[in-house]
Amino acid sequence: MQPELRTRATEVFGWTLRPDQESVIDAVLERRDALAVMPTGSGKSAIYQVAGLGLDGLVVVVSPLVALQEDQVVGLEHHSDAPRAVALNATKKARDVADAWDAVAAGEVGYVFLAPEQLVKDDVLERLRDAGVALVAVDEAHCISSWGHDFRPDYLALGEVAERLGRPPVLALTATGSAPVRDDIVERLGMRDPFVLASGFDRPGIRLEVVRHAEDAEKRQAVVDQVAELDGPTVVYVATRAATTEYADALAARGRRAQPYHAGMRVAEREAVHTGFLDGDVDVVVATSAFGMGIDKPDVRYVVHADVPESIDAYYQEIGRAGRDAEPAGATLHYRAEDFGLRTFFASGSPRPTSVRAVFDAVPATGSIARSALVEAAGLSARTAGRALNALLDAGALRDDVDGVSRVPDGPQDADRAARATADRAAERERVEESRIAMMRQLAETTGCRRQFLLGYFGDELPEPCGNCDTCSSGTAREASAHVADGANDAAWPPDARVEHAEWGTGVVMSTEEDRITVFFESAGYRTLALADVEQRDLLERV
């Protein structure tokens, strides 16, 4: 990185950047697309913030949560010499939004934070294009991947958004990008020869523990007993909104300053909890997965899961809220075997076929239609039409480009076939989600080193047990060392290698063990195969 920019970063933000951060910044300043996969708390936001100091134009930051947008704006405001930042979202008053746009037009703003559903609007794109965009930064970029654990269809339009903004460099940032997700991010954002940084996933300072329970009442009591005795800021993750209040009330009765948090609360209520936690007025936040992306609190000491997350990806991201100050932290998962059935139920859901057909029929057989006109033409609500359109785009039945939404020449040409294509895609994704839940069960039930298993899921192997998890402490990790991702067969089946299976199609090798291999298949999700079967029956072919 240029010495002048390095000095400027120190003067403005007080930061000394690491080489990996600088390498991504250099790529962006050379007008090259970049994908950075870095652990939670490793300074991903610093990349676009410092890059903004060296660019001539706006940095547009796509962020999925209002809380995350506001946190970043407040953080930048704490640095008096930093370029001005504004967040444009539905919680803002009309006057505040108008003032922010005036400042953008006048060249007084360096960073604009938006949600993806706002960024696709024609008037928003026109204003940004007129102001001049130097960089599009996509935060939580795994949300664009249908193979990611937090797929958000609104992200699908971002590749086209970049084109409509004049195709500035695109920077994608995420903490949970396994090889298949990284490939999907690059493809869906239309990235061109991107610089890809995938630093290690290990957070060795977080102690990993799992506790199995036979009964729900026993599990609930164990969670309350544990959290009531913990010392330090704590996040408790639960599966339902009702559980946030139940646990928060129980913990408050035990003397902890606990508050519930979920997406169904009013914005002001969520912000009050969020601010109270950051300021130290709230000790424990009991939350659904809605709480997390916007947390920039370095001294969280514990993350406790009262219910199993829907995937290892979600688990990894949520425990990553702990110990960002590099001090020791802990993560405990409480579960019953039945909890995995609950998560399987949560994994399903797709738009109605009638809505899909209506949207497909609203798109002309030749030519295109603007997104803004599609809602009225389909005769649906904006939300329903948007879900159906995203499903059709994801299935490859429609495409969205600078001219608008159009049919794919070699895709389905009638509504019934288009609806079947989206149903097939939904079934495919459900199989993938079920495989993620199965992998989460394996993590919970393994007697091997949990960190070895966790890292192996992401293709980041650990040769020896970590020494900082419950199975290492109990001694079972050493006894079970033949069944962990240790890279024993990497020579024949290296991580990230592409393979072909007769039934499941193309896949990517995630990790190998002494006697097995784990592969992610696009049509079937995660599958663990015995190496003896692979070799004797030629189940896999390198491609």
Where are the regions a protein language model picked out?
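C-terminal accessory region of SF2 helicases/translocases
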Residues: 282, 308-317, 323-500, 508-510, ...
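Gly/serine-rich nucleotide phosphate-binding loop at the start of the catalytic core
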Residues: 60
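Long, compositionally biased intrinsically disordered regions
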Residues: 246, 301, 491, 514-516
